Regions:
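Beta-strand cores of secreted/periplasmic/IMS beta-sandwich domains, seen most often
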Residues: 15-19, 48-76, 104-113, 117
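Extracellular/periplasmic metallocenter environments
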Residues: 5-6, 11, 22-24, 95-151
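N-terminal edge beta-strand
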Residues: 23-59
Length: 151
């Protein structure tokens, strides 16, 4: 008898976005190593496939939780392999070192400039392993998150 392994799809991405429209605030929850997708190099079960959209001027709170056995981090950067936060305060403390397994850190920043950024793990080699999502700051609109594979 052959045994078939079936991959469990990740949860819907909207589960990881909380919006407070009257106060112009969003909370993005990034769970590092949510599951085995991409050998655990993922946020929320996705590797490079989520696109978060936030209107310019809004306050963004990022909750970075590490569920994996390796150290992981979260930061907002511009461009591939950048280690400099794109906005003041847009990284966990010591993002190149990362969080130990089971730890959580938070940071808050103001989405002051339009553009396309990356929510990335800055531990050495992890961004190259596709442990990042897209963050788009737009002039107007509503906060959202989409699975780019579903487009």
């Amino acid at each position: 008898m052959a045994l078939a392994l079936v991959a469990t799809p990740p949860p819907p991405p909207h589960r990881f976005l909380s919006v407070d429209a009257p106060r112009h605030r969003v909370t993005i929850t990034l769970i590092a190593s949510y599951d085995a997708e991409n050998n655990g190099f993922n946020f929320d079960g996705y590797s490079r496939y989520l696109m978060w959209t936030v209107p310019q001027g809004w306050t963004v709170r990022v909750v970075c939780e590490n569920r994996g056995p390796l150290r992981h981090s979260c930061a907002v950067v511009q461009g591939a392999s950048s280690a400099t936060p794109a906005f003041r305060g847009a990284e966990i403390p010591q993002p190149q070192v990362g969080l130990e397994a089971g730890h959580t850190a938070r940071f808050t920043f103001r989405a002051s400039r339009k553009g396309v950024y990356r929510l990335a793990c800055l531990v050495s080699g992890h961004e190259e392993a596709r442990m990042w999502d897209v963050l788009k700051i737009v002039r107007h609109g509503r906060p959202s998150v989409v699975d780019l594979r579903a487009r």
